[in-house]
Amino acid sequence: MARFVVVPLLVLLSLFGLEAIQHPPKIQVYSRYPADNGKPNFLNCYVSGFHPSDIEVDLLKNGKKIEKVEHSDLSFSKDWSFYLLYYTEFTPNEKDEYACRVSHVTFSTPKTVKWDRNM
């Protein structure tokens, strides 16, 4: 009889344990093609390895949110951490600065990662 109570209790405790685990996202900002001023390209922000799944991602141009942004569906890895890809079309030039800003429960303030055109 005790076995019938203990097993469901252990299952419930393990599920609650999954919610308690928090992993900060890894943020990678890159362009689809090598940067070439004046030529259309895609700006990508790949956010991976995070848990829980609640996350806010913004692509920025000169510190301002880019409105026309698309993203992949939220997916998870074998370790149950999540990943997403945010992307938008853009045309790089010498004066504009691009970045990805991420808000997640593991960050006390949003984290911003700049696009390095030489990567």
Curated annotation (Swiss-Prot):
Superkingdom, natural source: Eukaryota
Subcellular location as annotated: Secreted
Residue ranges that the Swiss-Prot or TrEMBL entry lists as coiled coil: none
Keywords: Disulfide bond, Immunity, Immunoglobulin domain, MHC I, Secreted, Signal
Record carries keyword Disulfide bond: yes
Any one Gene Ontology BP term: antigen processing and presentation of peptide antigen via MHC class I
Cysteine pairs bridged by disulfides in the record: 45-100
InterPro entries: B2Microglobulin, Ig-like_dom, Ig-like_dom_sf, Ig-like_fold, Ig/MHC_CS, Ig_C1-set, MHC/Immunoglobulin
Domain Ig-like C1-type: start-end pairs: 25-114
Gene Ontology annotations for the cellular component aspect, listed alphabetically: extracellular region; MHC class I protein complex
Assembly and oligomerization: Heterodimer of an alpha chain and a beta chain. Beta-2-microglobulin is the beta-chain of major histocompatibility complex class I molecules.
Function description: Component of the class I major histocompatibility complex (MHC). Involved in the presentation of peptide antigens to the immune system.
Protein name (database record): Beta-2-microglobulin
